[in-house]
């Protein structure tokens, strides 16, 4: 968390988002010190909504006032909503926001994706590469509290983080963003 993480109008803004009526979350980032398949990621903003329709989520993201270079979201957002008859991705498109998704097995694999994202929290030298403005309170809380289910001896060990409905949405949005901006190469799903 750093106060000096600020919006730079000369740099593109990218978005990772996780759809959901009960909890929806979007993170807005800019890249610094970009290399071939890595960069410092500066999270400049967030949208965190509860009990909100997808159209309201899209409008809130638009209201931040950034011009978005790329938006990546949950592939499940391409499924048709039974009540509206259109997908979350189509709702965003109707608002002028094109959401990109990848459906390949490696990108969609949660275990591989979480492992990939860890590089930004701490690299092999112990240095962070994800820097977050303090106003992104819900993202910060989620990143600090994302966890795995408690293991009991009578259960199979779970390799996927706990879907708690509170902290997983921001973390999923970050995963969708980073696995698409910086694709996982030469890895197998799982």
Regions found by a protein language model. Name each.
Residues 162-164, 168:
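Outer-membrane beta-barrel pore domains
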Residues 36-162, 182-188:
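Mg2+-dependent endonuclease catalytic cores in nucleic-acid-processing enzymes, primarily RNase H-like
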Residues 171-183:
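Metal-dependent nuclease catalytic cores in nucleic-acid-processing enzymes
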Residues 19, 28-30, 45:
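Short, structured patches in soluble enzyme cores that scaffold and shape functional sites
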Residues 24-30, 175:
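Short beta-strand scaffold segments in enzyme catalytic cores
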Residues 30-36:
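Short loop/turn segments immediately following beta-strands, especially the blade-tip
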């Amino acid at each position: 968390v750093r106060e000096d993480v600020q919006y730079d109008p000369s740099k593109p803004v990218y978005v990772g988002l996780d759809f959901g009526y009960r909890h929806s979350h979007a993170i807005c980032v800019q890249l610094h010190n970009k290399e071939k398949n890595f960069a410092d990621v500066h999270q400049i903003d967030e949208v965190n909504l509860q009990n909100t329709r997808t159209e309201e989520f899209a409008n809130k993201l638009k209201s931040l006032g950034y011009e978005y270079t790329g938006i990546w979201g949950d592939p499940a957002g391409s499924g048709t909503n039974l009540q509206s008859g259109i997908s979350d991705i189509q709702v965003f498109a109707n608002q002028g926001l094109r959401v990109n998704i990848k459906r390949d097995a490696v990108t969609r694999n949660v275990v591989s994706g979480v492992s990939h994202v860890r590089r930004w929290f701490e690299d092999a030298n112990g240095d962070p590469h994800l820097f977050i403005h303090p106003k992104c309170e819900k993202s910060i809380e989620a990143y600090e509290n994302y966890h795995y289910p408690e293991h009991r001896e009578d259960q199979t060990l779970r390799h996927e983080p706990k879907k708690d409905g509170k902290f997983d949405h921001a973390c999923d949005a970050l995963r969708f963003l980073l696995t698409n901006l910086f694709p996982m190469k030469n890895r197998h799903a799982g």
